[in-house]
Structure formats: C-alpha cells, structure tokens
Swiss-Prot record:
It comes from the Archaea. InterPro entries: Ribosomal_uS4 (IPR022801), Ribosomal_uS4_arc (IPR022802), Ribosomal_uS4_CS (IPR018079), Ribosomal_uS4_euk/arc (IPR005710), Ribosomal_uS4_N (IPR001912), S4_RNA-bd (IPR002942), S4_RNA-bd_sf (IPR036986). Residues 104-166 form the S4 RNA-binding domain. Belongs to the universal ribosomal protein uS4 family. One of its GO terms (molecular function) is rRNA binding. Residues 158-177 are annotated as: Disordered. This is Small ribosomal subunit protein uS4. One of the primary rRNA binding proteins, it binds directly to 16S rRNA where it nucleates assembly of the body of the 30S subunit. The keyword Ribonucleoprotein applies. Gene3D superfamilies: RNA-binding S4 domain (3.10.290.10). Residues 165-177 have a biased composition (Polar residues).
C-alpha cells in the first residue's frame, strides 16, 4: 500500500534574511496587500520564481516543442490573470514579479472592487465567510482568482453585508451625526 506522501512547504524563504533593502521592500508589500506574515509573501515569490524558471527552460528547447509549450504557459498565466495580454511573449513572463501574483489574491480583488473599506477588512470579510465567488463561499484570502471568476465575486447570499455593504454603513453613520 505504501506510505502517504510527505507534505512539504510550498515556499522558499530568502537566502539571506537580514538584508535591509529586502526587509524594507517586504514590509511595504505586506502593508500594501494586507498579508498576515512574510510566509504569504515568500509563497508568492516562489510561485513567480517557478514560472520564470519555466520560461527560461523553454528558451533551451527546439523551436517546434518550444512554441507549443510557450503557448500553454502563456494561456495558463492569462487564465490566472497574472499576465494582461493573451499574445504575451516569454520576455513578459520573465518580467513578472510578486506583485503580479499578489494582485490576483481574493483579498486584493475584494478591496479593489469596493466590497471592503480597507485591505484588512477585506481579509476579515473573507475569513468570516461573507464573500462568495459564483454563490460558493470562499474563506481563504490567498485564493487566486481566475480571470473568469473576477466578475462573480460578491457577498454571500445570507450575509448581512449583502443588504448593507460596509461602505454604505459608514455613509449612513455620517449622515445621522
């Protein structure tokens, strides 16, 4: 029957953790995207690093195989929403950074759509089960929203925020005062 597969971490930390420039850059990204810890940032960096490595390895392939695999990789990244255009090149993939990935997190998109007042409130709404994608509750702020799912993000049907979104509640309190 065999032993179960050992689960390993999906992220790789920095090679040298105490470089001031990197620490400051990490703090800015953690604040901008409302991340809970640096591990979430390192996960994004690792995923982008793997996509860039794939693109570099495609450059060494013969032209026939390279073109088909290149199209597949570009289509995947386009569906994920990480690259903006469907006719991108390997240079566009090599130019990706962790911000391209962090922009596709559910937490960021909920905030940018205006469903939450702050990026931190967006995280709280997701964790507490107030956000749904296509009517299906999603409670993970790190969920990567595909390009086709972006328009389906809304409040969960039974959520009290469905009738009174956070932005409207704040406006009502100001008008009463």
């Amino acid at each position: 029957m065999g032993d179960p597969k050992k689960s390993r971490r999906k992220w790789e930390g920095p090679g040298h953790p105490w470089i001031r420039i990197n620490l400051e850059k990490e703090q800015v990204l953690i604040g901008k995207y409302g991340l809970r810890n640096k591990r979430e940032l390192w996960l994004a960096q690792t995923i982008i690093r793997k996509f860039r490595h794939q693109a570099r390895s495609l450059l060494a392939l013969p032209p026939a195989e390279r073109s088909t695999r290149e199209k597949q990789l570009i289509q995947k990244l386009y569906r994920m929403g990480i690259i903006e255009k469907d006719n991108a090149t390997l240079d566009d993939i090599l130019g990706l950074n962790e911000e391209n990935y962090l922009e596709r997190r559910l937490q960021t998109i909920v905030y940018k759509k205006g469903l939450a007042r702050t990026i931190y409130q967006a995280r709280q709404l997701i964790v507490h089960g107030h956000i749904a994608i296509g009517g299906r509750r999603v409670t993970s702020p790190g969920y990567i929203v595909m390009r086709g799912e972006e328009d389906l993000i809304d409040f969960y049907p039974t959520s009290p925020f469905k009738q009174h979104p956070p932005t409207q509640q704040g406006e009502e309190n100001v008008q009463q005062a």
